[in-house]
């Protein structure tokens, strides 16, 4: 949840890549995001995320969860990219964030933030390099107990 409060823009949509239980996108909706789309490669995550959203009073009119892989499914990417997001979240391991960094820019609106976390500190440099290589400039790095969160925007 580190950085979520700071980068959720009230009235703007959020995309959660690798949503798992949906905690981050649901929290963003509670913080005022207009809508959230969430994706996970595990189909079971869809039901879990919808259940957690319902427990927080969030309906499917504002919350869409899909099973799929944005690294391999071009149709899913095209569908998600029809909307541009003020905040794109990825709380997953470095081995997924690194290839995901090539896609993140497709989803961001002009001043949108790609907030990636779940990065073990020994891999943070690799993730930063991948973000930069893919046109994203890291402007904030937070570290806690050996874990790193990076916030990046499209490089200008």
Predicted regions and their residues:
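Conserved SAM/SAH cofactor-binding pocket of Class I
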Residues: 1-70
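A short acidic, Gly/Pro-enriched loop at the edge of an enzyme's catalytic core
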Residues: 75-87
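ADP-ribose/adenylate-binding Rossmann-like module
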Residues: 111-124
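Conserved short alpha-helix immediately C-terminal to the canonical SAM/SAH-binding motif I
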Residues: 44-48, 96, 123
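A short glycine-rich, Lys/Arg-flanked "PGG" loop and its adjoining helix->strand segment in the class I
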Residues: 98-113
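A short SAM/SAH-binding and catalytic strip from SAM-dependent methyltransferases
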Residues: 86-98
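Core SAM-dependent methyltransferase catalytic element
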Residues: 137-156
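Short beta->alpha hinge that forms the Motif I/post-I loop of the SAM-binding pocket
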Residues: 40-44, 92, 119
């Amino acid at each position: 949840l580190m950085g979520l409060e700071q980068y959720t823009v009230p009235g703007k949509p959020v995309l959660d890549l690798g949503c798992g239980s949906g905690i981050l996108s649901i929290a963003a909706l509670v913080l005022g995001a207009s809508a959230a789309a969430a994706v996970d490669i595990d189909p079971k995550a869809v039901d879990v995320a919808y259940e957690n959203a319902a427990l927080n009073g969030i309906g499917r009119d504002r919350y869409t969860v899909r099973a799929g892989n944005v690294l391999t499914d071009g149709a899913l990417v095209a569908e998600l990219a029809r909307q541009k997001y003020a905040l794109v979240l990825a709380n997953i391991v470095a081995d997924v964030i690194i290839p995901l960094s090539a896609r993140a820019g497709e989803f961001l609106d002009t001043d949108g933030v790609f907030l990636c976390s779940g990065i073990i500190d020994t891999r943070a440099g690799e993730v930063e390099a991948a973000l930069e290589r893919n046109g994203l400039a890291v402007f904030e790095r937070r570290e806690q107990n050996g874990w790193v969160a990076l916030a990046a925007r499209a490089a200008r």
